[in-house]
């Protein structure tokens, strides 16, 4: 894209309100046909569940989904990129759906339903453990940004918001959740001691998260471990397994903190991923940003070791002295750094940075071959598919 050099100097009228794009109104005939088809399906459904994904967030409809499950109690879950849509500590929320790699209660709640309302979903390989999801077209009602589907029939020209409003109204009439609600009120973990593992790290981190946080989890053990976190209300969870570009979170965190300087930004990244975009740490220090960065140090590309070549040198990386990196990237770094290898030490450091005033970098020492349960299930599914 080439522009004349003087374009940037031309006078411009600033907008008086936020720049928004209002979708075209729904095609009334298509909307009515969709309503009738959905009503026919829901009126005979004994068990209905809701599965939401990231396109709900992209189109600003999180509040609409939250209102929906509040007004119509039913089993609901998200896919990994949709984490944060719901208050995950409320009854009715089952967890993160990942095909055959899903926890048993989540898998049964979604795949065992007569009708699954799929809102803004994308069933990609890494989100479904290699396309192992068991959801048939006849079982699902799907809502996408500009079209919706009931069974095998697509209805075009229907904005997502209007499709959601239509389904919410129908659910109030036809959906009756007879399952005992899940009780997350006592969701907590006891004090954990000993050397850090994937399990003890995520359990310790769980107690640190609070409403309003912005959490960015890099592709790899960070994202696959974070799937089991129970997020409170109003947490923005940013992850990108759709493209799987490691190193994404440091740059994205710089943007998130720039956009929301008064919110707490938490970065979860691996040592291998962080090495690819570490220069953005310098940008954060230059702008006096104060994210909380947890570098999961497992001596290389652990996610790649799990998939292929656990002992191959191409999955090794240069070992850095992470707690000294801010000194190299700023002449006057406003940063605090720690290296922790014990669960108790991590808990103490997290307590210190809970109300921090400067950038915090925590190097978390983890076993080289330790992987989260979801990653283990995913690699087994991929291996089975490759060997078929």
Regions found by a protein language model. Give the residues of each.
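Terminal amphipathic helices with adjacent charged low-complexity linkers/tails
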Residues: 2-30, 139-178
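Glycine/aspartate-rich loop-and-adjacent alpha/beta segment that forms the canonical ThDP
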Residues: 4-31, 127, 351-388
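Glycine-rich ThDP/TPP pyrophosphate-binding loop and its adjacent helix/strand module
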Residues: 23-39, 44, 323, 332-360, ...
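Glycine-rich phosphate/diphosphate-binding loops that line cofactor/substrate pockets in enzymes
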Residues: 34-48, 68, 110-113, 204-211, ...
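Glycine-rich, anion-gripping cofactor-binding loops and their flanking helix/strand elements
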Residues: 52-143, 229-263, 275-279, 309-311, ...
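Conserved thiamine diphosphate
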Residues: 149, 173-190, 307-349
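Active-site diphosphate/adenylate-binding microenvironment
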Residues: 181-262
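A glycine-rich helix N-cap at a beta->alpha junction
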Residues: 285-304
């Amino acid at each position: 894209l080439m522009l004349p050099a003087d374009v940037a100097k031309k006078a411009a009228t600033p907008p008086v309100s936020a720049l928004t794009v209002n979708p075209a109104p729904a095609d009334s005939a298509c909307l009515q046909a969709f309503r009738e088809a959905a009503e026919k399906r829901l009126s005979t459904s004994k068990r209905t569940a809701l599965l939401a994904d990231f396109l709900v967030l992209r189109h600003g409809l999180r509040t609409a989904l939250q209102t929906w499950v509040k007004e119509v109690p039913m089993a609901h879950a998200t896919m990994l990129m949709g984490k944060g849509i719901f208050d995950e500590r409320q009854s009715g929320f089952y967890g993160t759906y990942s095909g055959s790699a899903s926890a048993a209660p989540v898998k049964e709640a979604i795949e065992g339903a007569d009708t699954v309302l799929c809102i803004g979903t994308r069933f990609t390989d890494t989100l479904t453990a290699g396309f192992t999801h068991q959801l048939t077209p006849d079982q699902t009602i799907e809502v996408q940004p500009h079209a919706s589907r009931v069974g095998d029939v697509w209805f075009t020209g229907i904005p997502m918001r209007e499709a959601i409003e239509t389904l919410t109204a129908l659910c109030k009439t036809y959906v009756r959740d007879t399952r005992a609600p899940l009780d997350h009120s006592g969701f907590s973990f006891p004090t954990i001691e000993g050397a850090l593992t994937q399990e003890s790290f995520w359990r310790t981190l769980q107690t640190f998260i609070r409403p309003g946080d912005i959490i960015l989890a890099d592709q790899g053990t960070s994202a696959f471990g974070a799937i089991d976190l129970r997020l409170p209300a109003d947490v923005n969870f940013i992850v990108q397994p759709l493209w799987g570009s490691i190193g994404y979170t440091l740059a994205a965190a710089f943007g998130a903190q720039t956009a929301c300087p008064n919110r707490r930004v938490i970065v979860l990244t691996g040592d291998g991923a962080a090495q690819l975009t570490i220069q953005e740490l310098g940008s954060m220090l230059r702008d006096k940003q104060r994210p909380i960065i947890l570098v999961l140090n497992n001596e290389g590309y652990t996610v790649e070791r799990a998939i292929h070549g656990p002992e191959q040198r191409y999955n090794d990386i240069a070992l850095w002295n992470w707690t000294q990196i801010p000194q190299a990237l700023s002449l006057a770094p406003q940063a605090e750094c720690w290296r922790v290898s014990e669960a108790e030490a991590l808990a103490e450091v997290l307590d210190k940075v809970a109300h921090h005033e400067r950038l915090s970098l925590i190097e978390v020492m983890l076993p080289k071959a330790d992987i989260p349960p979801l990653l283990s299930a995913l690699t087994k599914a991929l291996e089975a598919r490759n060997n078929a």
